Amino acid sequence: MIGGVAMMEQCGYILAILQENRVETATKVQEILTQNGCNIRVRLGLHDAGLESCSNSGMILLQICGEKAEAENLLMTLKAVPHVKAKLMSLDF
């Protein structure tokens, strides 16, 4: 049964990704996320958008399920992309 604490144990990592140049990095970042899609439970993309302009930087927040090694591998793969910063956080309640 997945619920409450059990769910957090299985999906207890948050990965924050900062893209400093979305035009250059979006395709590669999307490819990496697609390859790791089975471990991504939630994805939230944040950037300044409007009718007159759209920011070239943005942040993606992911809830990661699986083993810590899988989350760390995704982290290192993303950090290897130029203009991309990433940080892994563990939710330990």
What residue spans do the PLM features occupy?
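Long, contiguous binding/interaction regions
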Residues: 2-93
